[in-house]
Amino acid sequence: MAIAVDAMGGDRPLTVQVEAAVQAVKDFGVEVIIVGAEAQINQQLKQYSYDQQKVRVVNSTEIVEMNESPANALRQKKDSSIRVSVDLVKAGEAEAVVSAGNTGASMATAKYVLKSIEGIERPAIASIMPSIHRNHTYVLLDVGANTDCKPLYLFQFALMGDAYARTYLHLENPRVALLNVGEEEGKGYLDLKETFDLLKQSTLNFVGNIEGKAMFKDRVDVVVCDGFIGNIALKVAEGTFDFVRSILREEVQRSWLSKLGYLAMRAPFQQLRKRADYSEVGGAPLLGVNGVVIICHGSSKVHTLRNAIKHAQECAEQKLNDKIAVEVSENLEVIKQAKIMNGESI
Protein backbone atom coordinates (compact mmCIF):
# COMPACT_ATOMS: atom_id res chain seq x y z
CA MET A 1 0.00 0.00 0.00
CA ALA A 2 1.35 3.42 -0.95
CA ILE A 3 0.36 6.84 0.38
CA ALA A 4 0.86 9.83 -1.94
CA VAL A 5 2.27 12.84 -0.08
CA ASP A 6 1.79 16.29 -1.60
CA ALA A 7 5.23 17.77 -0.94
CA MET A 8 4.52 21.20 -2.41
CA GLY A 9 1.31 22.04 -0.54
CA GLY A 10 1.17 24.05 2.68
CA ASP A 11 2.79 27.04 4.31
CA ARG A 12 5.97 25.23 5.28
CA PRO A 13 8.93 24.31 3.05
CA LEU A 14 9.23 21.03 1.20
CA THR A 15 11.72 19.80 3.80
CA VAL A 16 8.88 19.31 6.30
CA GLN A 17 6.85 17.01 4.04
CA VAL A 18 9.91 14.98 3.08
CA GLU A 19 10.99 14.45 6.69
CA ALA A 20 7.43 13.49 7.68
CA ALA A 21 7.28 10.94 4.87
CA VAL A 22 10.59 9.39 5.90
CA GLN A 23 9.51 9.22 9.55
CA ALA A 24 6.25 7.52 8.55
CA VAL A 25 8.18 4.91 6.58
CA LYS A 26 10.42 4.21 9.57
CA ASP A 27 7.70 4.25 12.23
CA PHE A 28 4.78 2.59 10.43
CA GLY A 29 6.36 0.61 7.59
CA VAL A 30 4.15 2.39 5.09
CA GLU A 31 5.15 2.98 1.47
CA VAL A 32 5.08 6.61 0.34
CA ILE A 33 5.11 8.39 -2.99
CA ILE A 34 6.44 11.91 -2.51
CA VAL A 35 5.02 14.21 -5.18
CA GLY A 36 6.60 17.52 -6.16
CA ALA A 37 9.83 19.01 -7.46
CA GLU A 38 11.76 15.80 -8.01
CA ALA A 39 15.28 17.25 -7.90
CA GLN A 40 14.63 19.11 -4.64
CA ILE A 41 12.98 16.10 -3.03
CA ASN A 42 15.82 13.77 -3.97
CA GLN A 43 18.32 16.27 -2.59
CA GLN A 44 16.48 16.35 0.74
CA LEU A 45 16.22 12.56 0.88
CA LYS A 46 20.01 12.29 0.85
CA GLN A 47 20.00 13.48 4.46
CA TYR A 48 18.13 10.42 5.71
CA SER A 49 18.63 6.71 6.11
CA TYR A 50 15.49 4.79 5.12
CA ASP A 51 14.20 1.76 3.22
CA GLN A 52 14.53 2.97 -0.36
CA GLN A 53 12.12 0.27 -1.54
CA LYS A 54 9.36 2.10 0.32
CA VAL A 55 9.99 5.61 -0.98
CA ARG A 56 9.25 6.74 -4.51
CA VAL A 57 9.42 10.25 -5.94
CA VAL A 58 7.06 11.46 -8.67
CA ASN A 59 7.72 14.79 -10.33
CA SER A 60 5.20 17.61 -10.69
CA THR A 61 5.90 20.98 -12.23
CA GLU A 62 3.18 23.21 -10.80
CA ILE A 63 2.21 24.46 -7.34
CA VAL A 64 -1.25 25.49 -6.16
CA GLU A 65 -0.88 28.57 -3.96
CA MET A 66 -2.72 28.66 -0.63
CA ASN A 67 -4.88 31.62 -1.70
CA GLU A 68 -5.50 30.40 -5.24
CA SER A 69 -8.99 29.80 -6.59
CA PRO A 70 -9.84 26.06 -6.49
CA ALA A 71 -11.55 26.35 -9.87
CA ASN A 72 -8.48 27.99 -11.36
CA ALA A 73 -6.20 25.32 -9.91
CA LEU A 74 -8.41 22.56 -11.27
CA ARG A 75 -8.64 24.01 -14.77
CA GLN A 76 -5.17 25.41 -15.29
CA LYS A 77 -2.76 23.41 -13.12
CA LYS A 78 -3.11 19.81 -14.23
CA ASP A 79 0.47 19.02 -13.26
CA SER A 80 0.23 20.44 -9.74
CA SER A 81 1.43 18.29 -6.85
CA ILE A 82 -2.11 17.80 -5.53
CA ARG A 83 -3.47 16.87 -8.97
CA VAL A 84 -0.66 14.38 -9.61
CA SER A 85 -1.16 12.90 -6.12
CA VAL A 86 -4.88 12.37 -6.68
CA ASP A 87 -4.22 11.00 -10.17
CA LEU A 88 -2.00 8.35 -8.57
CA VAL A 89 -4.97 7.18 -6.48
CA LYS A 90 -7.20 7.17 -9.55
CA ALA A 91 -4.62 5.05 -11.40
CA GLY A 92 -4.36 2.59 -8.51
CA GLU A 93 -0.72 3.42 -7.78
CA ALA A 94 -1.61 4.89 -4.37
CA GLU A 95 -4.46 4.22 -1.99
CA ALA A 96 -4.52 7.58 -0.27
CA VAL A 97 -3.41 11.20 -0.47
CA VAL A 98 -2.11 13.44 2.31
CA SER A 99 -1.96 17.18 1.63
CA ALA A 100 -1.44 20.33 3.70
CA GLY A 101 -2.09 22.47 0.65
CA ASN A 102 -5.03 24.60 -0.47
CA THR A 103 -8.08 22.90 1.08
CA GLY A 104 -10.51 24.06 -1.58
CA ALA A 105 -8.23 22.85 -4.36
CA SER A 106 -7.72 19.51 -2.63
CA MET A 107 -11.48 19.00 -2.31
CA ALA A 108 -12.24 20.12 -5.85
CA THR A 109 -9.52 17.94 -7.32
CA ALA A 110 -10.56 14.87 -5.33
CA LYS A 111 -14.22 15.28 -6.27
CA TYR A 112 -13.42 15.86 -9.94
CA VAL A 113 -10.87 13.07 -10.39
CA LEU A 114 -12.04 10.40 -7.96
CA LYS A 115 -15.79 11.06 -8.12
CA SER A 116 -18.19 10.34 -5.28
CA ILE A 117 -18.90 6.90 -3.87
CA GLU A 118 -22.09 5.55 -5.42
CA GLY A 119 -25.05 6.75 -3.38
CA ILE A 120 -23.22 9.76 -1.90
CA GLU A 121 -24.24 13.17 -3.23
CA ARG A 122 -21.78 15.40 -1.37
CA PRO A 123 -18.42 14.52 0.22
CA ALA A 124 -17.86 15.91 3.72
CA ILE A 125 -14.86 16.73 5.90
CA ALA A 126 -14.78 14.96 9.26
CA SER A 127 -12.81 16.06 12.31
CA ILE A 128 -11.87 14.05 15.40
CA MET A 129 -12.80 16.02 18.51
CA PRO A 130 -11.82 15.57 22.18
CA SER A 131 -14.25 15.11 25.05
CA ILE A 132 -14.10 15.50 28.82
CA HIS A 133 -13.13 11.84 29.17
CA ARG A 134 -9.52 10.94 28.40
CA ASN A 135 -10.28 7.84 26.35
CA HIS A 136 -13.18 9.24 24.35
CA THR A 137 -13.08 11.21 21.12
CA TYR A 138 -15.87 11.75 18.63
CA VAL A 139 -16.45 12.60 14.98
CA LEU A 140 -17.78 16.00 13.91
CA LEU A 141 -18.92 16.44 10.30
CA ASP A 142 -19.22 18.33 8.05
CA VAL A 143 -16.61 20.91 9.09
CA GLY A 144 -16.33 22.91 5.90
CA ALA A 145 -17.01 21.13 2.63
CA ASN A 146 -20.70 22.08 2.27
CA THR A 147 -22.42 25.20 3.53
CA ASP A 148 -25.96 24.67 2.24
CA CYS A 149 -27.21 21.20 3.09
CA LYS A 150 -30.52 19.52 2.39
CA PRO A 151 -31.79 16.67 4.58
CA LEU A 152 -30.51 14.13 2.04
CA TYR A 153 -26.96 15.43 2.40
CA LEU A 154 -27.08 15.58 6.19
CA PHE A 155 -28.42 12.03 6.29
CA GLN A 156 -25.57 10.83 4.10
CA PHE A 157 -23.09 12.67 6.32
CA ALA A 158 -24.43 10.60 9.20
CA LEU A 159 -23.87 7.38 7.26
CA MET A 160 -20.30 8.37 6.43
CA GLY A 161 -19.60 9.56 9.97
CA ASP A 162 -20.84 6.25 11.36
CA ALA A 163 -18.57 4.30 8.99
CA TYR A 164 -15.62 6.52 9.87
CA ALA A 165 -16.20 6.10 13.63
CA ARG A 166 -16.30 2.33 13.16
CA THR A 167 -13.10 2.45 11.12
CA TYR A 168 -10.88 4.99 12.85
CA LEU A 169 -12.27 4.98 16.40
CA HIS A 170 -12.93 1.21 16.31
CA LEU A 171 -16.47 1.54 17.67
CA GLU A 172 -18.97 -1.26 17.16
CA ASN A 173 -22.16 0.78 17.36
CA PRO A 174 -21.45 4.55 17.29
CA ARG A 175 -24.00 6.88 18.84
CA VAL A 176 -25.06 9.38 16.19
CA ALA A 177 -26.58 12.78 17.01
CA LEU A 178 -27.79 15.81 15.07
CA LEU A 179 -26.42 19.19 16.17
CA ASN A 180 -29.36 21.44 16.97
CA VAL A 181 -30.55 24.31 19.15
CA GLY A 182 -32.27 21.94 21.57
CA GLU A 183 -32.46 18.26 22.41
CA GLU A 184 -36.19 17.82 21.99
CA GLU A 185 -37.62 16.34 18.81
CA GLY A 186 -39.14 19.08 16.69
CA LYS A 187 -36.40 21.62 17.41
CA GLY A 188 -34.65 23.55 14.67
CA TYR A 189 -35.54 24.68 11.17
CA LEU A 190 -37.41 22.49 8.68
CA ASP A 191 -34.36 20.79 7.14
CA LEU A 192 -33.18 19.66 10.57
CA LYS A 193 -36.62 18.33 11.47
CA GLU A 194 -36.75 16.34 8.24
CA THR A 195 -33.22 15.05 8.79
CA PHE A 196 -34.24 13.95 12.29
CA ASP A 197 -37.11 11.92 10.80
CA LEU A 198 -34.79 10.28 8.26
CA LEU A 199 -32.25 9.34 10.93
CA LYS A 200 -34.98 7.77 13.08
CA GLN A 201 -35.80 5.42 10.19
CA SER A 202 -32.18 4.45 9.51
CA THR A 203 -30.12 1.51 10.69
CA LEU A 204 -27.90 3.91 12.64
CA ASN A 205 -27.78 4.13 16.42
CA PHE A 206 -29.43 7.56 16.33
CA VAL A 207 -29.73 9.11 19.79
CA GLY A 208 -31.46 12.36 18.81
CA ASN A 209 -30.48 16.01 18.86
CA ILE A 210 -27.51 17.39 20.75
CA GLU A 211 -26.79 20.98 21.77
CA GLY A 212 -23.41 22.59 21.29
CA LYS A 213 -22.74 22.70 25.04
CA ALA A 214 -23.10 18.90 25.28
CA MET A 215 -20.77 17.98 22.43
CA PHE A 216 -17.80 17.39 24.73
CA LYS A 217 -19.62 15.36 27.40
CA ASP A 218 -19.02 11.80 26.11
CA ARG A 219 -22.67 11.32 25.18
CA VAL A 220 -22.22 10.71 21.45
CA ASP A 221 -19.67 9.39 18.95
CA VAL A 222 -20.78 11.18 15.78
CA VAL A 223 -22.17 14.72 15.56
CA VAL A 224 -23.77 15.72 12.25
CA CYS A 225 -24.21 19.27 10.94
CA ASP A 226 -23.71 21.30 7.78
CA GLY A 227 -20.25 22.60 6.90
CA PHE A 228 -21.02 26.19 7.85
CA ILE A 229 -22.06 25.32 11.40
CA GLY A 230 -19.42 22.61 11.70
CA ASN A 231 -16.58 24.90 10.71
CA ILE A 232 -17.71 27.50 13.23
CA ALA A 233 -17.98 24.84 15.95
CA LEU A 234 -14.49 23.57 15.13
CA LYS A 235 -12.93 27.05 15.13
CA VAL A 236 -14.72 28.03 18.36
CA ALA A 237 -13.38 24.88 20.03
CA GLU A 238 -9.85 25.66 18.84
CA GLY A 239 -10.18 29.28 19.92
CA THR A 240 -11.54 28.32 23.33
CA PHE A 241 -8.56 26.08 23.99
CA ASP A 242 -6.17 28.87 22.98
CA PHE A 243 -8.09 31.26 25.24
CA VAL A 244 -7.88 28.94 28.26
CA ARG A 245 -4.19 28.28 27.62
CA SER A 246 -3.45 32.01 27.41
CA ILE A 247 -5.36 32.76 30.61
CA LEU A 248 -3.52 30.00 32.47
CA ARG A 249 -0.16 31.25 31.20
CA GLU A 250 -1.00 34.80 32.32
CA GLU A 251 -2.23 33.73 35.75
CA VAL A 252 0.82 31.52 36.36
CA GLN A 253 3.05 34.59 36.03
CA ARG A 254 1.13 36.63 38.61
CA SER A 255 2.95 35.38 41.72
CA TRP A 256 5.53 32.91 42.99
CA LEU A 257 2.69 30.91 44.54
CA SER A 258 1.02 30.58 41.13
CA LYS A 259 4.31 29.39 39.63
CA LEU A 260 4.65 26.84 42.40
CA GLY A 261 1.11 25.66 41.73
CA TYR A 262 1.90 25.30 38.05
CA LEU A 263 4.87 23.08 38.82
CA ALA A 264 2.61 20.85 40.89
CA MET A 265 0.01 20.74 38.09
CA ARG A 266 2.40 20.56 35.16
CA ALA A 267 1.59 16.96 34.21
CA PRO A 268 -2.21 17.51 34.05
CA PHE A 269 -1.70 20.69 32.01
CA GLN A 270 0.47 18.77 29.55
CA GLN A 271 -2.22 16.11 29.23
CA LEU A 272 -4.81 18.81 28.58
CA ARG A 273 -2.69 20.23 25.78
CA LYS A 274 -2.10 16.81 24.27
CA ARG A 275 -5.80 15.88 24.28
CA ALA A 276 -6.73 19.10 22.51
CA ASP A 277 -3.86 18.93 20.01
CA TYR A 278 -5.01 18.09 16.48
CA SER A 279 -1.45 17.06 15.56
CA GLU A 280 -2.04 13.68 17.20
CA VAL A 281 -4.66 12.88 14.53
CA GLY A 282 -2.77 14.64 11.77
CA GLY A 283 -5.58 15.67 9.48
CA ALA A 284 -9.23 15.39 8.52
CA PRO A 285 -10.54 12.95 5.89
CA LEU A 286 -12.67 14.04 2.96
CA LEU A 287 -15.34 11.36 3.23
CA GLY A 288 -17.39 10.22 0.25
CA VAL A 289 -14.89 10.13 -2.62
CA ASN A 290 -13.47 6.97 -4.20
CA GLY A 291 -10.18 7.11 -2.37
CA VAL A 292 -8.76 8.21 0.97
CA VAL A 293 -7.93 11.92 1.09
CA ILE A 294 -6.52 13.43 4.30
CA ILE A 295 -6.55 17.23 4.50
CA CYS A 296 -4.09 18.88 6.90
CA HIS A 297 -3.58 22.40 8.24
CA GLY A 298 -1.32 24.45 6.01
CA SER A 299 0.97 25.11 8.97
CA SER A 300 1.34 21.41 9.86
CA LYS A 301 4.73 20.39 11.24
CA VAL A 302 6.62 17.13 10.75
CA HIS A 303 4.92 15.31 13.65
CA THR A 304 1.46 16.30 12.39
CA LEU A 305 2.10 15.21 8.80
CA ARG A 306 3.66 11.96 9.99
CA ASN A 307 0.48 11.22 11.93
CA ALA A 308 -1.65 12.21 8.93
CA ILE A 309 0.14 9.58 6.85
CA LYS A 310 -0.61 7.03 9.59
CA HIS A 311 -4.23 8.21 9.57
CA ALA A 312 -4.43 7.64 5.81
CA GLN A 313 -2.82 4.23 6.16
CA GLU A 314 -5.38 3.12 8.77
CA CYS A 315 -8.37 4.32 6.74
CA ALA A 316 -7.10 2.54 3.63
CA GLU A 317 -6.19 -0.69 5.44
CA GLN A 318 -9.53 -0.79 7.25
CA LYS A 319 -11.42 -0.32 3.95
CA LEU A 320 -13.25 2.82 5.05
CA ASN A 321 -14.93 3.36 1.70
CA ASP A 322 -16.24 -0.21 1.64
CA LYS A 323 -17.89 0.46 5.00
CA ILE A 324 -19.46 3.65 3.66
CA ALA A 325 -20.83 1.67 0.71
CA VAL A 326 -22.35 -0.86 3.13
CA GLU A 327 -24.02 1.93 5.13
CA VAL A 328 -25.51 3.28 1.91
CA SER A 329 -26.79 -0.13 0.79
CA GLU A 330 -28.42 -0.76 4.17
CA ASN A 331 -30.31 2.54 4.00
CA LEU A 332 -31.39 2.71 0.36
CA GLU A 333 -35.08 3.07 1.21
CA VAL A 334 -34.43 6.02 3.50
CA ILE A 335 -32.18 7.62 0.87
CA LYS A 336 -34.95 7.13 -1.69
CA GLN A 337 -37.40 8.88 0.63
CA ALA A 338 -34.93 11.73 1.15
CA LYS A 339 -34.56 12.16 -2.61
CA ILE A 340 -38.32 12.37 -3.00
CA MET A 341 -38.37 15.06 -0.29
CA ASN A 342 -35.62 16.79 -2.25
CA GLY A 343 -37.80 16.83 -5.37
CA GLU A 344 -35.67 14.32 -7.25
CA SER A 345 -37.16 11.68 -9.53
CA ILE A 346 -36.46 8.07 -8.51
Please provide the spans of the model-predicted regions.
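N-terminal charge/polar-biased segments
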Residues: M1-V5, D11-T15, N42-Q44, Y48, ...
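Short, glycine-rich nucleotide/cofactor-binding loops
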Residues: A4-T15, A145-F155, I295-S300
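Short glycine/serine/threonine-rich phosphate/pyrophosphate-binding segments
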Residues: R12-Q17, D79-G92, A96-A110, E121-A126, ...
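N-terminal glycine-rich anion-binding loop in soluble enzyme alpha/beta folds
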Residues: Q17-E68
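Phosphate/nucleotide-donor binding subsite
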Residues: Y50-A94
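Glycine-rich phosphate-binding loop
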Residues: L88-M107, K187, L192-L198, S202-L272
